């Protein structure tokens, strides 16, 4: 035995075997280092490639971009072998914009939890949740709630009583939390519907507790922790994140990222937690996602499973971060592919995954396809052009209603008044909301498109695109689109003298009736 505690082989045969094994280890290490060098790392920016050079059919991607237009996507990005093979932005969304990713936030928070475990800031996902909040007098703390562990939050099997269905029904409990003054307390105080670990139930409150635990364990705001441990290594510099009234970043939603940066998160998982030779998150954590065991009970075939903020389809070896209105990061390891989608409405996931897998079925480069590439380029250009909504003739009421301030009854939107100027050469609107003062009103104002094409302008950190058209002589349809959030709000305003009735609806399923009275 040598001074390092290693026993030398005792025969020439074993010496030869050991030498061969040593060569294998050395060559394997060299190969691994070579692999790292060969893999494109988009820290400072993504490389682009023709689809066929990466074994992807450009004609199939053209069909996919067209599908995106019909499905109200805001962006579509496909990466194969570490290179972008198509990238489409659907007007009025544009390259370089952040997009609210909704529940894709959960996958990012799950990744941060994995990093915290790897760094020892969270000792184990088996830690009891209540131990992270020793100063709180938690309601219903007796019984099964004491058994609640961080792992249950990560898999949404907390057992807390929570109504946030993955359907068109309103997420009642999530909305209650968002209206409360203490989100963490609201979640912790929920009664138990099941014992922890016994049933999956979609619950953004679970994830808000994970964010709160991260902030407590790391002594950092969750966004700052993300910047230091995840975003900076991946080259993600443009992110915003909603916080609760106490300043804790929302764990279940509220993160905004650019699509290219969303793709980096997916690429990190495709590379099993490594990035340019650096271990960002442990391979064991990636395996926790890739071998998810919690059935989501969606009643679909194939079945979906869940782990650490990610949806998985074991039968297809597909891994997805999924946000409301189809904000998506899709990882297909068998195809060496990552796809990102942002958008404004839900649609079936499985056909999209099948389209992506079929487009990247080839294992080697394909012959150049000039016709297919031209068609793809045409579809991408077409996506960037807004399609005009049909408009009819202007109503004689346009002059009558313009310049008046329409004051609304108290309402959930907080909308106090609306002023329209529809007769100017550049029509405009002005909306005042609760929360401001006479000297400094909380106000949004900007141009309105009356030709079927929306007019975009900055509204704080957001971009608002607005257009209007007459539906007959007394009803004005007013459409405002929060471009960065995928939220479209349509108001049918019916004027009756100095009064107006408004039927408001959003693409998120929210409807409301409002009433206003005009003042000069």
What role is predicted for each listed range?
Residues 2-3, 12-15, 19-94, 99, ...:
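N-terminal leader/targeting segments and the immediately adjacent pre-domain N-terminus
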Residues 238, 286-339:
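Active-site Gly/Thr loop motif
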Residues 323-389:
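Structured C-terminal helix/loop/strand segments within mature extracytoplasmic catalytic/sensor domains
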Residues 163-243:
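A small/polar active-site loop signature that marks catalytic segments
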Residues 206-213, 253-274, 327-344:
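Active-site-proximal alpha-helical segments within enzyme catalytic domains
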Residues 100, 119-160, 189-191, 218-257:
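Active-site helix/loop module of the DD-peptidase/beta-lactamase fold
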Residues 370-520:
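Peripheral terminal and inter-domain segments
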Residues 82, 99-125, 153, 210-214, ...:
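Active-site SXXK
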């Amino acid at each position: 035995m040598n001074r390092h505690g290693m026993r030398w082989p005792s025969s020439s045969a074993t010496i030869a075997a050991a030498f061969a094994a040593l060569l294998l280890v050395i060559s394997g290490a060299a190969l691994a280092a070579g692999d790292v060098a060969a893999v494109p790392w988009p820290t400072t920016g993504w490389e682009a490639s023709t689809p066929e050079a990466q074994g992807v059919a450009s004609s199939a991607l053209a069909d996919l971009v067209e599908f995106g237009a019909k499905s109200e996507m805001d962006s579509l990005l496909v990466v194969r072998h570490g290179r972008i093979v198509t990238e489409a932005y659907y007007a009025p969304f544009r390259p370089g914009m952040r997009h609210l990713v909704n529940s894709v936030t959960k996958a990012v928070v799950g990744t941060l939890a994995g990093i915290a475990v790897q760094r020892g800031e969270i000792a184990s996902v088996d830690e009891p949740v209540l131990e992270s909040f020793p100063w709180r007098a938690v309601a219903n703390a007796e019984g099964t709630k004491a058994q609640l562990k961080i792992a249950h939050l990560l898999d949404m099997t907390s057992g807390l009583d929570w109504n946030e269905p993955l359907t068109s029904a309103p997420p009642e409990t999530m909305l209650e939390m968002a209206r409360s003054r203490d989100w963490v307390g609201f979640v912790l105080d929920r009664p138990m519907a099941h014992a922890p670990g016994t049933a999956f139930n979609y619950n953004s409150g679970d994830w808000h507790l994970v964010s709160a635990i991260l902030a407590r364990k790391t002594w950092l705001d969750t966004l700052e922790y993300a910047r230091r441990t995840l975003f900076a290594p991946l080259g993600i510099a443009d992110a915003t994140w909603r916080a609760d009234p106490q300043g804790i970043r929302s764990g279940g939603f509220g993160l905004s990222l650019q699509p290219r940066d969303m793709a980096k998160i997916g690429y990190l998982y495709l590379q099993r937690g490594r990035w340019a030779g650096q271990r960002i998150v442990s391979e064991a954590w990636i395996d926790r996602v890739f071998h998810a065991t919690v059935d989501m009970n969606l009643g679909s075939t194939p079945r979906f499973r869940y782990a650490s903020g990610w949806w998985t389809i074991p039968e297809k070896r597909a891994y997805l971060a999924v946000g409301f209105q189809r904000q998506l990061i899709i990882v297909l390891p068998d195809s060496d592919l990552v796809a990102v989608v942002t958008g404004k409405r839900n649609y079936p996931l499985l056909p999209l995954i099948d389209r992506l897998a079929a487009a990247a079925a080839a294992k080697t480069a394909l012959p150049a396809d000039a016709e297919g590439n031209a068609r793809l380029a045409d579809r991408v250009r077409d996506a960037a052009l807004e399609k005009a909504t049909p408009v009819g003739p202007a109503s004689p009421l346009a002059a009558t209603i313009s310049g008046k301030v329409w004051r609304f009854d108290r309402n959930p939107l907080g909308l106090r008044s609306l002023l329209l100027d529809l007769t100017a050469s550049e029509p405009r609107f002005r909306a005042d909301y609760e929360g401001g003062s006479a000297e400094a009103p909380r106000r949004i104002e900007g141009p309105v498109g009356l030709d079927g094409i929306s007019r975009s302008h900055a509204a704080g950190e957001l971009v608002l695109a607005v257009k209007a058209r007459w539906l007959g002589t007394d009803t004005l349809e007013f459409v405002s689109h929060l471009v960065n959030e995928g939220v479209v709000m349509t108001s049918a305003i019916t004027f009756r003298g100095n009064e107006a009735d408004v039927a408001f609806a959003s693409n998120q399923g929210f409807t409301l009736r409002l009433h206003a009275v005009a003042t000069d």
